[in-house]
């Protein structure tokens, strides 16, 4: 299969620039992958698609305000850093602008001097390893000085940065939000739990590679970025019990899917507590191990995420669903509407 097989025309005005006032007021396209039937609903009605004994699996990662603006200590010239991942201790891999002026040994100061960094290594493509120096707790300093790194297709400024976090976000480490979870409110989750559905949390820290376009024609040549994931023993035990009792594992978003399927692939279809790095690429032809249904937002043309959804529901049905959504003026991407596929 080729990348072009997953292309579609998306009018730019359908790219949501801001979140809706109410999280669960977004639209929900329900797709039956067996019959091809589609229903236009609102997100709150996802509760009608869940049965007692099912497990709803969510990614509890929290987005870091990972964009930092500072000055070179020597010259006072402006520097922008985007934190990518914590490599060890206080060292981080970052994207730097302007990178060519940041040599090993360059010192950078941020804000009122509560945070500083020194470049320890030069990488390719504007990448650097920097070591941060600070007082108190790093994440607290970052929360006060950093800005949220919104996706490249969002041009509006975000008034409330919590709207780019899920209501259950707690494990800091992502460069982007697991956006399928943005639709849930605490009230809706309480209703779902009261129905007898198990709420299960895992962690996958979303990397910036999630926005990287596929640059090859042949899908077999595409290399996925790696992301850190973690599933606790308690969560794994709940999911095993759900499966044993005939319930479904319903994933919220592609990050939850990739974590569950990574673990299922690693342990011959069994669900076990695990942590590590995954670069799983789920595309048509993939044999599913764990996930029975899922919700997800609407993704970019030719993206690996459209390919993942197509692996579950079939390429033609997914493209039909996308064309339907465009005709019905669904909102796309991170702050957009959602679909539920079962």
From Swiss-Prot:
Keywords carried by this UniProt record: Cytoplasm, Queuosine biosynthesis, S-adenosyl-L-methionine, Transferase
Broad EC category: transferase
One Gene Ontology term, aspect cellular component: cytoplasm
N-terminal signal peptide: none
Pathway participation: tRNA modification; tRNA-queuosine biosynthesis
One of the protein's GO biological processes: tRNA wobble guanine modification
Record-annotated membrane-spanning stretches: none
EC identifiers of the protein: 2.4.99.17
Record's keyword annotation contains Oxidoreductase: no
Compartment(s) of residence: Cytoplasm
Keyword NADP: no
Entry coiled-coil feature ranges: none
Reaction equation(s) it catalyzes: 7-aminomethyl-7-carbaguanosine(34) in tRNA + S-adenosyl-L-methionine = epoxyqueuosine(34) in tRNA + adenine + L-methionine + 2 H(+)
GO molecular function annotation: S-adenosylmethionine:tRNA ribosyltransferase-isomerase activity
Superkingdom, natural source: Bacteria
Stored InterPro entries: QueA, QueA_dom1, QueA_dom2, QueA_sf
Subunit structure: Monomer.
Recorded family membership: Belongs to the QueA family.
HAMAP family registered for this protein in UniProt: QueA
Protein purpose: Transfers and isomerizes the ribose moiety from AdoMet to the 7-aminomethyl group of 7-deazaguanine (preQ1-tRNA) to give epoxyqueuosine (oQ-tRNA).
Protein name: S-adenosylmethionine:tRNA ribosyltransferase-isomerase
